[in-house]
């Protein structure tokens, strides 16, 4: 394989000649330090290479070494609980090797530890017919994750050999498959190119909600397992805290958090918090189900693209094992900015605001890899990849290209409003601008498993919030006293919805996570208040009298979100009784 020669260097872009027969997206090693790069354009025998490491110090005429392989990652036991850079190099291994807190250029470290022995339990026997995606055995990687060892998608045939139960490294052959005379060894680890989606048998409609413990996300704008969501918002509106809440409390089996071009402090927060936090669904440390990919703002720009693909490929791998995985990316705007930077250096024709014309297709490729699927292989199983990505529009302008193009491909939109954030209303998700295309799909699950009136209660809350916004314009002009009594009740109910339900403290031990049952109980209190109060208003009782009769009950309902734990829901029975008693007394007064 012939090596190339550097002819031009422009930041992270290197042009090399003598690259005849090179392939698009082939990985190459650039210069004497052997920096990792990827071919993104070929013109004759010239290759345009985006380099994933700092190119300072390399010179024209230095060699470019071809590898003949696309950018691939290692998939196997040892991924959970690790923190990788954008090229899937484990940061702890780099620190041990270099004895430095900085990543040395050109360093090569195996993604999966070669020395650790894993206890393998075989699930198939010699002579079995094997095809890609079959589970041939399991490794208990963490107390939370049973790592299912899969046959690589391109392998099929008869199982010629399989090892006995025991301890093996990821490089030890654990099985041999006879593929029409050719022998294919299977190891605990396999490699997969990051730009190629992993195969599946069938894509299914997402019908089960991905519970997040955040009330506004679960109830007002729910996301389904296998869904796609975007969280756009200006600086300081709470994107990172919302995404961290998703990563901490979501009912996903595996969470992959990609810090793409954001501040390093945010990844440090994750590393500091996750080992001490308990997963509310299992009671185990959160790090036992989490993989972190750190590609922070001070790391090379080009590697941002790689980090997004590395994250989604790992998510697909765990999906193929039959798990529900969540990929959290913060933020895709930084990836788009990297594409713009490289497009400018390659002298491509810019589109809107300087972004490349292929930005929509790149975003579409990324979001298309989400979904709930029936996997290939035996036994039959179902898995999902849910994608939630932050978008950082400059100045909060949602019409800029990255936000507007992202909106074409996602089914859930959680827009963050800086005016809500300034009013200390968190999560600062604007309930008038947001939407979810999954409400109809997940309503049946909520009605069956949580509360048969869930859809009715949710729709009442949404209608009230929309009507309150219409009335707010009138109140600004003529004041609240001129409103009809039923409209005054709308304002009071909307205040209760916002204070008792939509506001949530991500740093409060009790309020940070609301179980579906707790959410339904709070909704039920608001629904009862609105239903009974509407009846009384129709009978001529003023809204002010109803609110005054409540005394301290409404503040008690508002405080209940941070006072009543998820396993103490019987305390809501007492609040419900008090509420009904107040209305019964008012009805007696109205009847006399």
UniProtKB/Swiss-Prot annotation:
It catalyses: ATP + H2O + 4 H(+)(in) = ADP + phosphate + 5 H(+)(out). Pfam families: ATP-synt_ab (PF00006), ATP-synt_ab_N (PF02874), ATP-synt_ab_Xtn (PF16886), ATP-synt_VA_C (PF22919). Keywords: ATP synthesis, ATP-binding, Cell membrane, Hydrogen ion transport, Ion transport, Membrane, Nucleotide-binding, Translocase, Transport. ATP binds at residues 233-240. It comes from the Archaea. It is found in: Cell membrane. SUPFAM superfamilies: C-terminal domain of alpha and beta subunits of F1 ATP synthase, N-terminal domain of alpha and beta subunits of F1 ATP synthase, P-loop containing nucleoside triphosphate hydrolases. Its main location: membrane. One of its GO terms (molecular function) is ATP binding. The keyword Ion transport applies. It is an enzyme of class 7 (translocase). Belongs to the ATPase alpha/beta chains family. NCBIfam families: ATP_syn_A_arch (TIGR01043), PRK04192.1 (NF003220). This is A-type ATP synthase subunit A. It comes from Saccharolobus islandicus (strain Y.G.57.14 / Yellowstone #1) (Sulfolobus islandicus). The lineage of its organism: Archaea, Thermoproteota, Thermoprotei, Sulfolobales, Sulfolobaceae. The gene is atpA.
